[in-house]
Amino acid sequence: MIQLTDAHAHIKNEKQAMERITLGIPTMACAGTPGEMQELEKFGRLQGAEKILIPACGLHPWYSDKWEPEEMFSLMEKVPVIGEIGMDSVWCDVPLDRQRKALEKQLQFACEIKKPVVLHTKGQEKEIARIISHYPNTYLVHWFSGDTGLEDYLKLDCYFSIGPDVLWNPAVQKVAEQMPGNRILIETDGMEAVD
């Protein structure tokens, strides 16, 4: 039997956490704010969660105008993975300069504490590839769905997660075909993306 792992998800409530625990689906559960991390810590105390929920946290670019990255550092020290962090010029109104500063502070901290990073790159694929080239680490580019920057990330030995849209979106299928098989992971980003 094949064991599936969800490489990136946001778990919104106890019901979603219990579904994953009951089904035995290992999940990298990401928290993008201090409040989300509190919820994730609560879910981590559910019976069976320690073998299923893999916590990750970092200041998500959508919230980089509400918190400083340093407010997440003590939380980042508690988890095995940093993320999701990055930049977004498609779904986010936070000025890119502020997003960039938050990203660079978190990348520096991730390097200092030697933890891998999950990246959010929407609309900023080339810029983020340029930035991370200065912070050698292990990176997962989450829900990678475009060909912009693919070669840059491959040169940096990054991993990629692809979402459910690979099942019906020809553009995502084309990108997935260009990725090395040993660099592709699957993700839901949360059950809302699957429903």
Enumerate the language-model features and the residues they cover:
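Mid-domain alpha/beta scaffold segments of enzyme catalytic cores
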Residues: 1-195
